[in-house]
Amino acid sequence: LWVKKNGKLTKKNSITKPVDINKNPIIDTSLFEESRLYRPMAGKVYKMYPIETIRGCPYTCKFCNSPDQMKLYKGLGHNFFRKKKIDLVYRELKYFKDVHQIEYNYFWADTFLAMNRKELDAFCEMYQEIKLPFWMQTRPETINDYNIEKLSKVGLHRISFGVEHGNEEFRAKILDRRWKNKDIIEKLKIPHKYGVAFSVNNITGFPTETKKLAFDTIELNRHIEADNANIYSFVPFHGTPLRKMCEELGLIKPETITKCLTNKPILNMPQYSPEEIEAVKKCFSLYVKFPKSRWKVIERAEKNDTEGNKIYKELKQEYLEKYMPK
């Protein structure tokens, strides 16, 4: 907390040691309406609860606040990344299942599989007693046959993976995600081997990105047999390395406050306009699923005019009939 008076800094509290998440009490959900526990998942609605296993993330993606959090606390001799003890995770799971009749758990850790094999085995042994389906999110490089097979046997129902961008050089340099496309493709063949559905998340509209680079993301997704693929506009949040980059490039003012949900892309870049970003997002699923022989028609559907909207409506209906689960 900083306090200013007459334009002068009067007090600056020092940053304290991160909260010990193993000392936190179980959240009292009785404060909220029961209806808030119901959430959709893959076409169904479940009574669902978010469970914390870790806080923070060991990775340093530049669109995320994790790098600055880690750097800030490391400079003070602390570690922002923390894991909850498995017996406490079990206590929460058991409590919400028995007291609130939870039907489905979702683990909201940024990277659920940021754990070693011993920790994974302990989780699976513990979760055998819970016997509820669950969702997790993680990175493609964290999965293997061993952990997905074990998790599938105790209730893993669905996974979300962050792929983010399809150009290897751009992804490494701008996002600090250093993995080969061929490795991502191979890893994402694993979930379906064990009957686990998954989605992939992508982002477009990064600083210095072009529409041509965005099509590398489309191309990568064409080689991944995801149950669904999502794409979102980049948001330059304060406290992230890419926010600093955007300010240095003059793409956003330092005082501009961003929101999680935006009506349109925030960055107005000459090489990749907000209109182009929106067009890529609008037709992303069509480009990913339809054969390339249809791309010229899809390109016309990008246009927000009478003819473009008519073509888009027809393609969307075709997509729903062919590719959406009945």
Regions found by a protein language model. Name each.
Residues 1-18, 233, 239:
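Glycine-rich beta-alpha loop elements in corrinoid/cobalamin-binding modules
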Residues 14-15, 24, 62-64, 119-120, ...:
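Short aromatic-enriched loop/helix-cap "lid" or pocket-rim segments at secondary-structure transitions
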Residues 29-198, 219:
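Radical SAM [4Fe-4S] cluster-binding motif and immediate context
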Residues 56, 196-201, 224-229:
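Conserved beta-strand->loop/alpha-helix structural units within folded catalytic cores of enzymes
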Residues 112, 163-176, 188-213, 232-238, ...:
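Conserved strand-turn element in the central/C-terminal portion of the radical SAM core barrel
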Residues 147, 207-223:
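Catalytic cores of alpha/beta
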Residues 159, 249-258:
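Flexible glycine/proline-rich, aromatic-decorated loop/lid segments
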Residues 241, 254-326:
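Radical SAM enzyme core and accessory elements
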